[in-house]
Amino acid sequence: MKDKVRVAVVGGSGYTGGELLRILVTHPKTEISVITSREYAGKPVSLIHPNLRGLISLNFTNFSIDKISDKADAIFLALPHGVSLNYAPKLLDLGLTVVDLSADFRLKNPELYKIWYNYEHPYPDLLDKAVYGLPELHYEELKNAKLIASPGCNATATILALAPIVATKITDEKKFISDVKVGSSEGGAKPSEGSHHPERQNAIRPYEAEGHRHAAEAEQELSRIAKANISVSIVPHAVSSIRGALASAHTWLTNELEEIEIWKKIAEFYRGKRFIRIIRGNIHPYPDPKFVIGSNFADIGFAVEKRISRLTTFSAIDNLMKGAAGQAVQAFNISMGFNEDDGLKLVPLRPA
């Protein structure tokens, strides 16, 4: 292997692309060789990402598969849903490792793309080959993976909250509700009526409450763990913070367990997981996205309302890090045989 892996970031002008660059520019084993943007081709990267001044001297270029294959060993696709699938097959044929941050290869059942994304998937064979890039659940499969499907942020928060619950049979319930509060950066760099600052500030606004498409990912992964059909309703809420996502996942206890037993089961499930922190019994008793901002950590906690046997598990992440770019690099590291935390030894910001 070369001293450093040459990486390309396709779609490098958005928030997720910029976050990938922020991580990769200090990664000890990568060299950023190509950064593409159709809109800003020819312009300096630091013009669009001023936080990278003095760190990246490259200009954005137009995306060309043939040219990029000569300059890169691995490629991160930070593109809209339905776009990456047009490029991934040829990139794989050219021998590149592909990390796709869209939803195009996350779901194993091609029929689900008709339901949730309104298109028929043209490469169902690649869905079988793609590895869902949640390292806490797929670490071994990610080793030497060539096509990584990086999870969605709301799906990540929900799955991390519920995985230990279904895996360790803390409850026999098969239906869960995940209430996710998420910051405005989830909406991307291009403002819309819903993400425009005057409209978003001071808002707590539910959206896609009748069925959020990240539920398909959550059900797929949780059903696999539980070896049973799990149903998840994800109800996201847009809040006025810029970064961060908090999933509060609700269910009912069907088994008589003391809280210490629940804590032990969750802690054991996540034992040795580099970026999982279990939050319990301090002056900040529940996970809060404020304390993971800028990092790849996921803080996990829970609460039991004994009166009605309600169990709520919490998962706090930075939606641009563990919910997007950070997790993508974490999965990439594993696929390359690097240290899992290369480029990701980032301390959360405080205050944030």
UniProtKB/Swiss-Prot annotation:
Report the InterPro entries cross-referenced here.
Answer: AGPR_AS, AGPR_type-1, LysY, NAD(P)-bd_dom_sf, NAGSA_dehydrogenase, Semialdehyde_DH_NAD-bd
Q: Where is the active site?
A: C153
- SUPFAM superfamilies per the UniProt record, alphabetical: Glyceraldehyde-3-phosphate dehydrogenase-like, C-terminal domain, NAD(P)-binding Rossmann-fold domains
Which cysteines are disulphide-bonded?
Answer: none
GO MF annotation list: N-acetyl-gamma-aminoadipyl-phosphate reductase activity; N-acetyl-gamma-glutamyl-phosphate reductase activity; NAD binding; NADP+ binding
Taxonomically, the superkingdom here is Archaea
Q: Which residues form a coiled coil?
A: none
The residues the record assigns to binding NADP(+) are S13, G14, Y15, T16, N319
Entry keyword set:
Amino-acid biosynthesis, Arginine biosynthesis, Cytoplasm, Lysine biosynthesis, NADP, Oxidoreductase
Q: Which GO terms describe its biological process?
A: arginine biosynthetic process via ornithine; L-arginine biosynthetic process; lysine biosynthetic process via aminoadipic acid
Where in the cell? Answer: Cytoplasm
Substrates-to-products reaction catalysed: [amino-group carrier protein]-C-terminal-N-(1-carboxy-5-oxopentan-1-yl)-L-glutamine + phosphate + NADP(+) = [amino-group carrier protein]-C-terminal-N-(1-carboxy-5-phosphooxy-5-oxopentan-1-yl)-L-glutamine + NADPH + H(+); [amino-group carrier protein]-C-terminal-gamma-(L-glutamyl-5-semialdehyde)-L-glutamate + phosphate + NADP(+) = [amino-group carrier protein]-C-terminal-gamma-(5-phospho-L-glutamyl)-L-glutamate + NADPH + H(+)
What Gene Ontology cellular-component terms does the record carry? cytoplasm
Pathway connected to this protein: Amino-acid biosynthesis; L-lysine biosynthesis via AAA pathway; L-lysine from L-alpha-aminoadipate (Thermus route): step 3/5; Amino-acid biosynthesis; L-arginine biosynthesis
Under Enzyme Commission nomenclature, its number is: 1.2.1.103, 1.2.1.106
The UniProt entry's sequence similarity note says: Belongs to the NAGSA dehydrogenase family. Type 1 subfamily. LysY sub-subfamily.
Q: What does this protein do?
A: Involved in both the arginine and lysine biosynthetic pathways.
Protein name as catalogued: [LysW]-L-2-aminoadipate/[LysW]-L-glutamate phosphate reductase
The scientific name of the source species is Saccharolobus solfataricus (strain ATCC 35092 / DSM 1617 / JCM 11322 / P2)
The gene that this protein is the product of is lysY
